[in-house]
UniProtKB/Swiss-Prot annotation:
Organism listed in the record: Pseudomonas fluorescens (strain ATCC BAA-477 / NRRL B-23932 / Pf-5)
Name of the featured protein: Bifunctional protein GlmU
Cellular component, GO annotation: cytoplasm; membrane
UniProt xrefs under InterPro entries: Bifunctional_GlmU (IPR005882), GlmU-like (IPR050065), GlmU_C_LbH (IPR038009), Hexapep (IPR001451), MobA-like_NTP_Trfase (IPR025877), Nucleotide-diphossugar_trans (IPR029044), Trimer_LpxA-like_sf (IPR011004)
Region (Linker): 227-247
UniProt cofactor(s): Mg(2+)
Gene this chain is encoded by: glmU
Length: 455
């Protein structure tokens, strides 16, 4: 059975008080609409139609992709009118309708809903709520069959007492959708074309309305203001934390941990408080991450340790390597097994060989550093001449003295040593000692300057 998906994303979101279209507001580092599209793709539809209106150009620019068909709704005349804009493009047997501001919907929930659809049956996702204020109410007959959905503003007192609410998410036979949207009327309190009226039409046409419910009501929670957006964020993070813990991760405090992307984890991983994982992060077995760390698009091999207040972006830490506290590993950085990066060390596009060490107050950029090499405190690679970047190469078992400036391009061969305080501008051969500093001069009888008296 073929499937197409329609995502409604045309709303203005005035209560957000923002120039940004509502569906582009972020949850866990991705726009709300981005989350919905991600879930939709996992259902393997033949096409995804995104109905856009307010901020249409911004939405299209942010999320444009080959599998998305953006459909413009010039005037926002209701959900039924929005779906009708996509109908001319639909050819599939089944159409699933989703909402661009409902980012937490689970794929498993949608899969259950889709199983309810057939030529003579549609699937409707409903939710039981203690307080259904704002939701359309699911009206059932004496046999428990769904007969209609009544919107809050059109409901009488008895209907408002119903606690089963409409989520708006439904799956319908594709061949019938055009007929139903064509018959919609705006004769209601809002003066809009309600998609919910399709339910009564389906019942009138003799179709069965089968319902499913999410395991968690937050799956179908939308965000109309910043408070609701924050609630979605926190729920997403707690859910992400539970998933990681189920895979063998210890979180010191799941309430102080954020995932903003994709995380692949091994077992016996320990993550302390206030850690943020962004982009695609791979964490192998026995990794330890200290508090207040930000890790983006990085890979941490087995047994790697990141100490407090460190920042990784586009880095790879080898097996048993460690970094921090207060280390910064920028894009292109690779630490081989057992390499050590200490406090206040910054690396960019740098490769540290096995067992290499940079313990303190160091900048290494565009550098290749051999195994077991030791970088003294206060060392920097001078890799930029104002126009081009140049490479510093150090062989194995090199000893770099403290407070060195290594002016690239420069090659320090295996076994070489540089003296403390040196500025190294020339290549150093194997086993050589390089001294690149002024000779010390001691002056006898030196008299310190006296303080000038002010008038």
């Amino acid at each position: 059975m073929s499937l197409e998906i329609v995502i409604l994303a045309a709303g203005q979101g005035t209560r957000m008080r923002s120039a940004l279209p509502k569906v582009l507001h972020p949850v866990a580092g991705n726009s709300m609409l981005g989350h919905v599209i991600h879930s939709a793709r996992q259902l393997d539809p033949q096409r995804i139609h995104v109905v856009i209106g307010h901020g249409a150009d911004a939405v299209r620019e942010r999320l444009d992709a080959d599998d998305l068909n953006f459909v413009l709704q010039d005037k926002q005349l209701g959900t039924g009118h929005a779906v009708a804009q996509a109908v001319p493009f639909i050819t599939a047997d089944t159409v699933l309708i989703l909402y661009g501001d409902v980012p937490l919907i689970e794929v498993e929930t949608l899969q259950r809903l889709l199983k309810q659809v057939g030529p003579e049956q549609l699937g409707l996702l409903t939710v039981e709520l203690d307080d259904p204020t704002g939701y359309g109410r699911i009206v059932r007959d004496a046999d428990g069959k769904v007969v209609a959905i009544v919107e809050q503003k059109d409901a009488d007192e008895a209907t408002r007492a119903i606690t089963e609410g409409n989520t708006g998410i439904l799956a319908v036979p594709g061949k019938r959708l055009g007929d139903w949207t064509g018959r919609l009327s705006n004769n209601n309190a809002q003066g809009e074309y309600y998609l919910t009226d399709v339910i009564a039409m389906a019942v009138s046409d003799g179709l069965i309305v089968a319902t499913e419910q999410p395991h968690d009501a937050m799956e179908v929670q939308g965000a109309n203001d910043r408070k609701q957006l924050a609630e979605l964020e926190r729920h997403y993070q707690l859910r992400a934390g539970r998933r990681l813990m189920a895979q063998g991760v210890t979180l010191r405090d799941p309430a102080r941990f954020d995932v903003r992307g994709e995380v692949i984890v091994g077992r016996d991983v320990l993550i302390d408080i206030n850690v943020i994982l962004e982009g695609r992060v791979v964490i192998e077995d026995d990794v330890i991450i200290g508090p207040n760390c930000v890790i983006k698009d990085s890979t941490l091999r087995k047994g790697a340790v990141i100490k407090a207040n460190s920042h990784l972006d586009g880095a790879v830490m080898g097996e048993g390597s460690d970094a921090g506290p207060f280390a910064r590993l920028r894009p292109g950085t690779v630490l081989e097994a057992r390499a050590h990066v200490g406090n206040f060390v910054e690396l960019k596009n740098a490769h540290l060989g096995q067992g290499a060490k940079a313990g303190h107050l160091t900048y290494l950029g565009d550098a290749v550093i051999g195994a077991r090499t030791n970088i003294g405190a206060g060392t920097i690679t001078c890799n930029y001449d104002g126009v081009n970047k140049h490479k510093t190469i150090m062989g194995e078992d090199v000893f770099i003295g403290s407070n060195n400036s290594l002016v690239a391009p420069v090659d320090i061969s295996s076994g070489a040593t540089t003296a403390a305080g040196s500025t190294i501008t020339q290549d150093v051969a194997p086993a050589q000692l390089a001294v690149g500093r002024a000779r010390q001069k001691n002056i006898d009888g030196w008299k310190r300057p006296e303080k000038i008296k002010k008038d």
